[in-house]
Amino acid sequence: MTVGVEILETGVVGAVVDDSGRVTARAASDVGADLVAAVGAALERLSSASKGSSSLGIAASGMDPSAATRVIDSLTSRRSRALRKAVVGCGTAAALAESWIGAAAGVDSVVYFGVEPHAMAGVVRGGRPVIGAHGREPAVGWMALNPVEREDYRKSGCLDAEVAAAGIVRRLIWRIKAGDRSRVQDAVGGDLTAITYDLVVEAARAKDGVSISVMRDTAKYLGMAAANLVIMSDPAMLVLGGIMASAGDQLLEPIVWELGRRLPGPMMDALTIRSATLGPDAVVIGAARYAGFVNTTES
């Protein structure tokens, strides 16, 4: 068994994963002001279930690999000291998990692309994760898809500013302020600060025209980004996760259509596209899988 941990913006999620990829125990803790303490707390909660584990995989996105390494090197609990550790990006972890026991099980050339809450991507080739020269995964959130200068693009990247939950909400608010009428505005009693991504999706499903338009614009950005990932990697399968899986009824068809417009015909014909199947467990499962890869190589 191996322990996988995902570092989120506001919390830490950990899981014990057996040799078949099954999650046998879970734990979570709030980050607060001390990330190291939060990771340590999650590990302590898993301590009884993780007896016999020898490896710890920690997945973190938006964090420099060296910073993530310093976090795990700072873990002081007796349990964490006994584990061999490895750090991986969340997108790469999700790609590993989906290619192991998820939508791409048995496929040795996979690109994973997901958004929730931020854009992330990972590449598996020959059944192994593809990691950059400096330990980074594809920084898909920074993909430049709009040739304009905007402050939010400089802070979080063009793609992330457009397709992350906050970007989708912001575009709906812009439409409302421009004079378009949406049922979302009624749902929040006119308080635009109360609008959430979930409200936008629910309204789109209820045939709210403005919300449908915002989701279609989102799908266009997602399709362009997915096409660029495929063009660069030429995978056998593209796995779409996060909101592209959970809101697939609104996003999947226009994303596939956009892919068809932007990929060379033979490349599109050879590509298999699937929705991710592992949901929120994908990253912790993949982190555990990555730790197994690293420690097998080092042995």
Predicted regions and their residues:
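Short hydrophobic alpha-helical segments used for membrane anchoring or interfacial signaling
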Residues: 15-18, 88, 115, 124
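Glycine-rich phosphate-binding loop of actin/hexokinase-like ATP-binding domains
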Residues: 105-166
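ATP-dependent carbohydrate kinase catalytic cores
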Residues: 83-99, 103-105, 111-113
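Short glycine-aspartate micro-motif
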Residues: 2-6, 53-59, 109-114, 120-122
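ATP-binding/phosphotransfer module of carbohydrate and carboxylate kinases, centering on a glycine-rich
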Residues: 1-55, 66-69, 73-81, 97-106, ...
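Short, glycine/charge-rich beta-strand/loop segments that flank catalytic centers
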Residues: 56-62, 90-94
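Conserved A3 ("GATE") glycine/threonine-rich loop of ANL adenylate-forming enzymes
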Residues: 10-11, 91-94, 116-120
